[in-house]
Amino acid sequence: MQGTDNATMLVGRVLLSLLFLIGGTIKLLGPAATQAMFVKQGLPMVEAAWILAVVVEVGGGLAMLFGLFTRPVGLVLAIWCVATALIAHSNIADRAQEIQFFKNMGLTGGFLYVAAFGAGAWSLDAWRSRRRGAVAAE
């Protein structure tokens, strides 16, 4: 891969991770508001849903940012985007919800692309792979 490809993949991962890092941090710091939103959306077990949301969004966002376990994390975040679109943004008669729904579908496409092609050379996945190769060569 060329350096520009790796730079592009890094920028893409950073941009994909931002939404989750920001949203997950807001959920982490505001559990009552997040759980109230979940109640309004009709979710059961709002405390468990809050924990799951924080783990997926902050953990997945950090993993995507640093390119760690990128392919499986890409699949998890793609599924998360579809699930949240269907649960929280399915009222497409409301223009704002329609925009959020299709934003999530677009993010799903980005995460599927990352799941298919990986993080690139500028990632912890690539570093770990190089380390394994160096250890195997010793």
Segments predicted by a language model, with ranges:
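Extended, low-polarity transmembrane helix blocks
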Residues: 1-29, 47-55, 59, 65-138
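Short juxtamembrane and helix-loop transition motifs at transmembrane-helix boundaries
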Residues: 31-43
